Amino acid sequence: MSNLEHEAERVEMAAATTEIRQRVLELRQLVQRASYAYYVLDAPILEDVVYDQLYRELQDLETQYPELLTPDSPTQRVGEQPATQFVSVQHRIPLYSLENAFAVADMQAWQDRWQRQGQAIGEQSATLRSPEYVCELKIDGSALALTYENGVLVRGATRGDGVYGEDITANVRTIRSIPLRLDWPDPPPIVEVRGEAFLPLDVFHRLNQEREQAGESLFANPRNAAAGTLRQLDARIVAKRRLDFFAYTLHLPLASARSATQPAAAQQLDLLAVAQSDPAVAAQQLDLSSASQAESVTTHLPQTQWQSLELLQQIGFRVNPHRQLCPTLADVRQYYDHWNHGRLDLPYMTDGVVVKLNSLRLQEHLGFTQKFPRWAIAWKYEPEQAVTEVLNISVNVGRTGALTPVAELRPVQLAGTTVSRATLHNRDRLAELDLHIGDKVVIHKAGEIIPEILQVFPELRPADARPYQLPTHCPECGQPVVQPVDEAVTRCLNVSCPAIVRGAIVHWVGRDAMDIDGVGEKLVRQLVDRGLVNSVADLYRLTVAQLLTLERMGNKLAEKVVAAIAKSQSRPWSRVLYGLGIRHVGSVNAQVLTTAFPSVERLMAASAEDIEAVHGIGPEIAQSIVQWFQTPANHSLIEQLSAAGVQLAQDTVAVPPSQLPQPLAGKTFVLTGTLPTLSRDEARSMIGQAGGKVTDSVSKKTDFLVVGADAGSKLDKAGQLGIPCLSESQLLELLEET
């Protein structure tokens, strides 16, 4: 072939490549536009068959020419490989929670507070007298923080504790109403969008039907289903569940937010906030790379929350269509009343109304408390109630032998779900209600999750209604039950009780204990009912042949179960101790105890005084441990576990409690609110183990206040005294650093 022919071929190939590149870009634009119209605007512009043809053509070209594949392509929403874990990430701008209101008086008090704050900072009285509010539905889902760099989605994270969340980008990319690339020419270098991921009701009901047919446990409500879906390690499962997303907040992080090692208040880090006071400084802080970017960003910045929502919609997001501008608090009340009655007609769950001051300038001036923005509030719906009839009262027996009475109800719709059971807690609650079988009762969902009986109508009690008394014998094993002194709980003390055995094994195989994959409640029930397992030690004697006698058990699955059980033999001593299910010994306490007593022999030989000497371990825990090891059946269990090869010691040398590291020695802590992952006892134990002291009230002697959700007056007092506040993650960091 001549040089001329070579050159002609090269030119022809280059032309073909250019043509293909152009076609790929064209297909991406078509598919993205069609997806936006379908998933965001709910106004399809292409027939499904045409969309599928275009999508497949794009997919084929990207496979044939992998150099043309980019992360923002619509074909890249779902990855092929499941993740192994989620990584903790710090939010550039914190995700604040909202203050809650439950009545008109709460809303009026909130308005009075922000108006007083406005007067204190010199805000014009006309602005304070005539505010404008934006009302939005409070979607009952999971909050997400999305980060875009140069217009491309690079990170999706959960809310977490508001400072740290989990990176779930692969899962976020599967949500079709979240754009992979913003429809924003010359966007700012970094754009952050906050919103709510949720499961539409029709998808939720279909998902539960599929789970029921597969013999899997049902999701309690769409919120739990959405949260559980987002935490799936396999994005392919997430994609199948068809989550949706509404955006409600736009942030344009300044350079200071991108370089900060500790999060600051949102108004100090966001261009939209800073620009309300000094647009020139804000544009300078953005580090814009071109004049066109500067003009595009700084000349079209929203001045109001309403404009922010409109901009979010313009750049590709779905924004809730039921938002409304309200000139007065009276208009806000009308909006609330409308949706309080009309919420069940929506195709998704809501749990209230979010009310925000419309002016971004006023938002910036009012700022934040340590927990909430002063310029926004969540007006929660009243818990939905319903009247129904008690058909029967049954009793559940837990792993500790506790008998919990449960009311069996005539099925009724409550907060969007069918309710047929309600907990009665214990003997004292039964006595307080004076409940009879046949009574008409009012039920509600505590926190709109757990059904419980709120009120009994004795005047409507039928003549044949029967009073109820807790059984004197265990309904599972028939042995007499006891009422421990100073406890409202009635207990079965038979360690061979099937319910206690099942509960103990389910606890043992759980994620925080031995983490035995493939062994769930249904399999445990079969194993106990068939007499194959009577204690956790029996798990380690199971064979494939025995498992094959169970329902829905094939050879491959049986081999996996046996392998998973064998793998658990190497779990550390701290997990074993927690897995034993000793009352009051949580996972954190177990770690503390196994540090002080690095073998089961050392712990068995310890007195209550020895155990109580460990920082963070109180007399109740110490006595519970001593009593557990004094029981002959538990001695036998330890011997069987040892023979099975389970780790009952750790390699470290025992350290006397008095010589354990005490990095927080001399520091006094107070706990308030609900922490994301730790219980109060676990946090108290960790602080005590490190030498710190936890007290119940805030004073000048308090060094740190550890703050969780729904913190109370302790937070206000700490603010008045200038006491530093820590989130759970900051407490854990402090413990790790020291």
From Swiss-Prot:
Cofactor list: Mg(2+); Mn(2+)
Residues noted as binding Zn(2+) in the record, renumbered to the chain: 474, 477, 492, 497
Uppermost EC category: ligase
Residue ranges of domain BRCT in the record: 659-738
InterPro entries named among the record's database cross-references: BRCT_dom, BRCT_dom_sf, DisA/LigA_HHH, DNA_ligase, DNA_ligase_AS, DNA_ligase_CS, DNAligase_adenylation, DNAligase_N
Gene Ontology biological-process annotations: DNA repair; DNA replication
CDD domains (UniProt xref): BRCT_DNA_ligase_like, LIGANc
Domain of life: Bacteria
Keywords, alphabetical: DNA damage, DNA repair, DNA replication, Ligase, Magnesium, Manganese, Metal-binding, NAD, Zinc
Keyword Translocase: no
EC id: 6.5.1.2
Keyword Manganese: yes
Active-site residue list: 138 (n6-amp-lysine intermediate)
Swiss-Prot/TrEMBL catalytic activity: NAD(+) + (deoxyribonucleotide)n-3'-hydroxyl + 5'-phospho-(deoxyribonucleotide)m = (deoxyribonucleotide)n+m + AMP + beta-nicotinamide D-nucleotide
Entry's Gene Ontology molecular function annotations: DNA binding; DNA ligase (NAD+) activity; metal ion binding
GO cellular component: cytosol
Pfam families: BRCT, DNA_ligase_aden, DNA_ligase_OB, DNA_ligase_ZBD, HHH_2, HHH_5, Nlig-Ia
Residues where NAD(+) binds: 48-52, 97-98, 136, 159, 196, 356, 380
Recorded family membership: Belongs to the NAD-dependent DNA ligase family. LigA subfamily.
Known function: DNA ligase that catalyzes the formation of phosphodiester linkages between 5'-phosphoryl and 3'-hydroxyl groups in double-stranded DNA using NAD as a coenzyme and as the energy source for the reaction. It is essential for DNA replication and repair of damaged DNA.
This protein's name: DNA ligase
Gene name per UniProt: ligA
